[in-house]
UniProtKB/Swiss-Prot annotation:
Organism listed in the record: Salmonella typhimurium (strain LT2 / SGSC1412 / ATCC 700720)
Family: Belongs to the helicase family. UvrD subfamily.
Membrane among keywords: no
Name listed for the protein in its UniProt record: DNA helicase II
GO MF term list: 3'-5' DNA helicase activity; ATP binding; ATP hydrolysis activity; DNA binding
Its biological purpose: Has both ATPase and helicase activities. Unwinds DNA duplexes with 3' to 5' polarity with respect to the bound strand and initiates unwinding most effectively when a single-stranded region is present. Involved in the post-incision events of nucleotide excision repair and methyl-directed mismatch repair.
NCBIfam families: PRK11773.1 (NF008743), uvrD (TIGR01075)
Gene Ontology biological process: DNA replication; recombinational repair; SOS response
Annotated UvrD-like helicase C-terminal domain residues: 287-564
CDD domains: DEXQc_UvrD, SF1_C_UvrD
Cross-referenced SUPFAM superfamilies: P-loop containing nucleoside triphosphate hydrolases (SSF52540)
Length: 720
């Protein structure tokens, strides 16, 4: 039988994995090493060479997109669709199983799946029905608690509270939630896996049926599995099934949502004699980029070990840029992208990666100023985010009480006991009397036309808005914004959200304060009050909208969102201690290695050119912060890195330190630290100098106006 079509396009290690005898196998697949190709060709090998039936194969992926691509590529390779295989995500396959055996799983035939929004709404109702204070027992935290317990395979009666009243209350919420779901025939995502696992445990004959059927199990991205997913695979395989897992311990970056990189080692322990094959040849990046990635990840302990290599070109060195601040950093990145575009490169080939969503705002503004289209991958633009729109709505209502859209958004955010029934009365009266919602509320309260509790809550809300408007009127814009975020209860509400999502929302609110501090008037805004001018600016930015999907646009995304993607030109910004690695990882033991794996993922996204940037000073989350360069920069081989400009000592062993100083004076006669006066912006201090002659530029920090770049020849600055 001619099997050359299955092997000819593969390298030696890929061939070894594809053509191995049927056995348990770990394929350690480095970034860009062709793991999807290996999985597809392995399935084709099992079908055509080993003569296994499609019905014997289950392939598990982590996204529906990956599953669809795998099915498509298998069909292309085999020349026909292979019916009978189960190819899908853990959740998709568990759902299929429960549909087939709904009675044995104690589910109605027409059971419905709850998405996270539905889950939140149900929990909100239950917490209220249990007479619990929603501020103390937030629905989002309840959802996190329940999903975490299910991911560990735990039902309410399994949980040991040890007399802890907080744990006991969450246990009761979980119990009430589960009973409500069972009554209504509802199943959330975590329940799909747990219920399917319990089905096999409670009905051995069903488990045996699937063990006899699925004798070949293949699992992709194994480093991202959690405990219940591992238990699911282990139970199905039994003693006779053959399991091939594909994963990369160096790319395990989802520990915060329950992923267990240790599952790879558990597999080796539970399947003694399993073969390990390392895919180390990289088809994506240049040799310089791979050398940097290898050196970086070698600083982690307990790795299973592999070293990426390529037979491609050495490529350009990694560029390292030290910016004065985040504005300079954004300007530098945009200028580099402009140069790439001018040389014939597409904008879509450029990706800007950052650790935190809050970092995108300054980058977005720089791209907008350069009229450069961009797209936020897997996320929303800064001014479109929920928490930002909440805060802006408070500011809008303070600026204009008759803003009905802003009123609707914040009247019960955070919850104040102003229910839909009360608001329906307000809306109807507004229509009848042809008045705004605010005006109607005033009249209804004066007429005592609303129920007591709701009336009191509405009265307090209106007093809050009036007080904020009066007390903050003369404050600087950033102080006013910070006060509104705190006094409105928004900050407290989002602080109660568990996990990374809540932390991200707080960071974004603090970044909004920074945005108001850095905001500077355009000429057309000069007749407006600062708050009105900023709100106009925010509305216009949000109104720009995402670049159309067909449009050539720069890609912006978090490092987590970048996993699995590749780009010719990659920028990783904010490479500073406390930013990346994040402060949380420095404060919590065991998190630093996951941050380093995240850096490794970022570096290995780059195909041709990688640029790393850090700032000496950064106004982030509402305050000026001075950070040291990230330790990850110091872990890169010196010969792989070329510094565009260096302003601080890089954090690396003393023998490798490279030091530099900023340009202190240029041929215009201006000096760093010199006090100057501008006709429009007032007094400020020169914080950066660049270029010479007619191209000389100055960066000046103006009091109350932010930091601005000026062309020295046209600035007409006076020395103070």
């Amino acid at each position: 039988m001619d099997v050359s079509y299955l092997l000819d396009s593969l390298n030696d290690k890929q061939r070894e994995a594809v053509a191995a005898p049927r056995s348990n196998m770990l394929v350690l697949a480095g970034a860009g090493s062709g793991k999807t190709r290996v999985l597809v060709h392995r399935i084709a090998w099992l079908l055509s060479v080993e003569n296994n039936s499609p019905y014997s194969i289950m392939a598990v992926t982590f996204t529906n997109k990956a599953a669809a691509e795998m099915r498509h590529r298998i069909g292309q390779l085999m020349g026909t669709s292979q019916g009978g295989m189960w190819v899908g995500t853990f959740h998709g396959l568990a759902h299929r199983l429960l549909r087939a055996h709904h009675m044995d799983a104690n589910l109605p035939q027409d059971f419905q799946i709850l998405d996270s929004e539905d889950q939140m709404r149900l929990l909100k109702r239950l917490i209220k029905a249990m007479n619990l204070d929603e501020k103390q027992w937030p629905p989002r935290q309840a959802m996190w608690y329940i999903n975490s317990q299910k991911d560990e395979g735990l039902r309410p009666h399994h949980i040991q509270s040890y007399g802890n009243p907080v744990e006991q209350t969450w246990q009761k919420v979980y119990q009430a939630y589960q009973e409500a779901c069972d009554r209504a025939g509802l199943v959330d995502f975590a329940e799909l896996l747990l219920r399917a696992h319990e089905l096999w445990l409670n009905k051995p004959h069903i488990l045996q049926h699937y063990r006899e059927r699925f004798t070949n199990i293949l699992v992709d991205e194994f480093q991202d599995t959690n405990n219940i997913q591992y238990a699911w695979v282990r139970l199905l395989a039994g003693d006779t099934g053959k399991v091939m897992i594909v994963g990369d311990d160096d790319q395990s970056i989802y520990g915060w949502r329950g992923a267990q990189v240790e599952n790879i080692q558990r597999f080796l322990n539970d399947f003694p004699g399993a073969q390990t094959i390392r895919l180390e040849q990289n088809y994506r990046s240049t040799s310089n980029i791979l050398s940097a990635a290898n050196a970086l990840i070698e600083n982690n302990n307990g790795r299973l070990g592999k070293k990426l290599w390529t037979d491609g070109v050495d490529g350009e060195p990694i560029s390292l840029y030290c910016a004065f601040n985040e504005l300079d950093e954004a300007r530098f990145v945009v200028n580099r992208i402009k140069t790439w575009q001018d040389n014939g490169g597409a904008l879509a080939q450029c990706a800007i990666l950052y650790r935190s969503n809050a970092q995108s705002r300054v980058l977005e503004e720089a791209l907008l100023q350069a009229s450069m289209p961009y797209r936020i991958y897997g996320g929303m633009r800064f001014f479109e985010r929920q928490e930002i729109k909440d805060a802006l709505s408070y500011l809008r209502l303070i600026a204009n009480r008759n803003d009905d859209a802003a009123f609707e958004r914040v009247v019960n955010t955070p919850t104040r006991g102003i229910g839909d029934r009360t608001l329906d009365v307000v809306r109807q009266t507004s229509r009848d009397r042809q008045l705004t919602l605010w005006q109607v509320c005033r009249e209804l309260l004066q007429e005592k036309a609303l129920a007591g509790r709701a009336a009191s809550a509405l009265q307090r809300f209106m007093e809050l808005i009036d007080a904020l408007a009066q007390e903050t009127a003369d404050m600087p814009l950033h102080v006013q914004t910070d006060r509104v975020i705190k006094d409105s209860g928004l900050r407290t509400m989002y602080e109660q959200e568990k996990g990374e999502k809540g932390q991200t929302r707080i960071e974004n609110l603090e970044e909004l304060v920074t945005a108001t501090r850095q905001f500077s008037y355009n000429d057309e805004d000069e007749d407006l009050m600062p708050l009105q001018a900023f709100l106009s600016h925010a509305a216009l930015e949000a109104g720009e909208g995402q670049a159309d999907t067909w449009q050539d646009a720069v890609q912006l995304m978090t490092l987590h969102s970048a996993k699995g993607l590749e780009f010719p030109q990659v920028f990783i910004v904010g490479m500073e201690e406390g930013m990346f690695p994040s402060q949380m990882s420095l404060d919590e033991g065991g998190r630093l290695e996951e941050e380093r794996r995240l850096a490794y993922v970022g570096v290995t996204r780059a195909m041709q050119k990688l640029t790393l940037t850090y700032a000496e000073t950064r106004r982030l989350y509402g305050k000026e912060v001075y950070h040291r360069p990230s330790r990850f920069i110091g872990e890169l081989p010196e010969e792989c890195v070329e510094e565009v400009r260096l302003r601080a000592t890089v954090s690396r062993p003393v023998s490798h330190q490279r030091m530099g100083t900023p340009l202190a004076e240029n041929d215009t006669g201006y000096k760093l630290g010199q006090r100057v006066r501008h006709a429009k912006f007032g007094e400020g201090t020169i914080v950066n100098l660049e270029g010479s002659g007619e191209h000389s530029r100055l960066q000046v920090a103006f009091q109350g106006q932010g930091i601005k770049w000026l062309v020295a020849a046209y600035a007409k600055l006076e020395t103070v």
